[in-house]
């Protein structure tokens, strides 16, 4: 009869490493998040893509995905997600957040300019003097003429040409500071 060899394992001698169990669902959620990060990378312009720290293999995969369509694009995004799982995606996510935040800040500035333009056309002189106090180097005569033209265009239901010119002037005036 064969004897069973029993191994005696002393747990106290071994260093106790804490085992972290990760559920299959959590792994899938993480993979899906990385795939979405890959989609964001594919949708970036070349100049924005240059600002993100990517290794050459990942960069080539993203540039290839930008040229693909439909099913090939889907498979390439899956592949990009796989490449992202092999590296630390944190620096990539941070760089992407900076780019998106910069875009949101730019949109907010343009929205403020639109509100200022509306205020100038509706309120007239009171808003105009406030603007001149904030920006004394503004061309007073030109801006005043644009505001009057925009008010006339609004009254006569004409296309808002001066209205757009006010926005362009404010954009040049304020965003150059």
Curated annotation (Swiss-Prot):
Example of a GO biological process term: assembly of large subunit precursor of preribosome
Classification via Pfam families: DarP (PF04751)
Domain of life of the source: Bacteria
Molecular-function GO terms, alphabetical: ribosome binding; rRNA binding
Compartments, as annotated in UniProt: Cytoplasm
Keyword vocabulary terms for this entry: Cytoplasm, Ribosome biogenesis, RNA-binding, rRNA-binding
Keyword rRNA-binding: yes
CDD domains in alphabetical order: YjgA-like (cd16331)
Main location: cytoplasm
Gene Ontology cellular-component terms listed: cytosol
HAMAP family with a match to the protein in the record: DarP
PANTHER family, per the entry: UPF0307 PROTEIN YJGA (PTHR38101:SF1)
UniProt record similarity statement: Belongs to the DarP family.
Record's function text: Member of a network of 50S ribosomal subunit biogenesis factors which assembles along the 30S-50S interface, preventing incorrect 23S rRNA structures from forming. Promotes peptidyl transferase center (PTC) maturation.
Protein name as annotated: Dual-action ribosomal maturation protein DarP
């Amino acid at each position: 009869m064969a004897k069973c060899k029993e191994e005696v394992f002393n747990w106290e001698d071994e260093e106790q490493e804490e085992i972290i169990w990760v559920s299959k669902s959590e792994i899938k959620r993480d993979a899906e998040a990385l795939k979405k990060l890959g989609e964001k990378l594919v949708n970036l312009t070349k100049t924005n893509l240059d600002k993100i720290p990517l290794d050459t293999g990942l960069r080539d995969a993203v540039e290839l995905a930008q040229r693909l369509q439909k099913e090939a694009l889907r498979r390439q995004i899956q592949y990009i997600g796989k490449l992202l799982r092999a590296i630390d995606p944190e620096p990539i996510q941070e760089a992407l957040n900076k780019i998106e935040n910069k875009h949101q800040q730019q949109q907010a500035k343009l929205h403020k300019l639109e509100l200022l333009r509306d205020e100038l056309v509706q309120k007239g002189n009171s808003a105009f003097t406030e603007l001149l106090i904030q920006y004394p180097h503004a061309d007073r005569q030109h801006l005043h003429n644009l505001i009057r033209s925009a008010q006339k265009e609004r009254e006569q239901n004409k296309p808002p040409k001066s209205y757009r010119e006010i926005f362009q002037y404010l954009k040049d005036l304020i965003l150059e500071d």
